[in-house]
Amino acid sequence: MKFGGTSVGTPQRMKDVVKLITDGEQNLVVLSAMSGTTNSLIEISDYLYKQNLEGALTCINKLQDKYLGHIAELYSTDEYKALTTKVVGEIFDRIRSCAKTDFTSREERIIVAQGEMLSTNMVTNYLLEQGHNVQLLPALEFMRTNADKEPDLKYIKEHAELVLAQYPNKDIYITQGFICLNVDGEVDNLQRGGSDYTASLLGAAIGASEIQIWTDIDGMHNNDPRFVENTTPVSHLHFVEAAELAYFGAKILHPTCIQPAQYANIPVRLLNTMDPIAPGTTISNITEHRKIKAVAAKDNIIAINITSTRMLLAYGFLRRVFEVFEKYKTSIDMICTSEVGVSMSIDDRTNLIPILNELKKFGVVEVDDNMCIICVVGDLDWRNVGFESIAAQALKDIPVRMISYGGSNHNISFLISASDKQRALRSLSDYLFK
């Protein structure tokens, strides 16, 4: 079970979370930092990078006072108020110990990690005060990344099992999301996917019956509710469908979180702490055949077109183009080819200028900025006649720069101008879901 920053954002919401995790099952619970805390810790780090010690200490004291207020509200006994005040004080002393003139990214990572330390200690102590059989598990004892900054799956599995074996008879285990050790043994974080990724990795490592991701939204919706009215939650998604939606813009879940659960074949449920009886969305390896599930949009896309007569009947041309993107570690979202041209889209403009300069060796390069990918997701196997034509018909009045279909049985994507995004989402909703 994973609960995000909003779900543990106030003492009352922490109490609500406790009601959900004390359900009679043996639960491993992953918690994010309280909402707003990570931003405050980053602000403290910014002051220290600028060598503004006074500004950093002012922010530290202000944040600690805020937590002292949370403690007074959360606990009912003097014993646990005093115990948690002591623990929280030690965490803030750790933050202050990083406040020095030779401040580096190492100290920043230590500071940012304290948000999860605060939330997990507070919830664990509240559970103890309420008489529950609970154990706090330090994530730094089993979460680690390798030399490529990817999760070390073998290490995580082995060490999570070792730590859990030390406390075999507990009903609830609490641990931190997001944070880990890197290959050098330094405090670090998972970077992509955050606490959701931690929950998925741990669920796969221990063979959980299911992985629950609790947020303030009742599952994945069939369209973006910020732009389309009357969207509805999708009751079930295949792992690939969920990954496609997450990659192409569904903010409720990061695409990296799907992979560990999919490999271990463990269902993922997206649930709402504000409405815990809502069914949410279940993600599994089951496909609902011949059904379109949802639409998502990915913003800030750049389209690149290369036209070259040298490409005609030439082998190795695409390989050389791809090598440019590999060199600059830039992923391609969509690609279409013809006899004399290739078009592709990217969303990372970090190395756009050097990429374009190198691509000009191959032909005439044209760039369209401010584009958007609209992704339609479902069981879109090519043998299922008609679905692609329905999606295309919905966009008949909108200029389409590129279409990608066939790379996946679960996705058809349209590249359009960002200015047409809302109109496209609404039209697709009208055609597909009404």
PLM features per residue range, with description:
Residues S7, L28-V29, Y173-T175, E186-Q191, ...:
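Structured core elements
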Residues V8, T37-T38, R144, L181-V183, ...:
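Flexible loop/turn segments at secondary-structure boundaries
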Residues E25, H132, I266, T330, ...:
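Short phosphate-binding/catalytic loops that engage adenosine nucleotides
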Residues H238-R310:
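A conserved active-site cap/scaffold subdomain adjacent to cofactor or substrate pockets
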Residues P279-K434:
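A conserved regulatory-domain signal marking ACT and ACT-like small-molecule sensing domains
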Residues M1-L253, I258, S417:
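Nucleotide/pyrophosphate-binding catalytic subdomain
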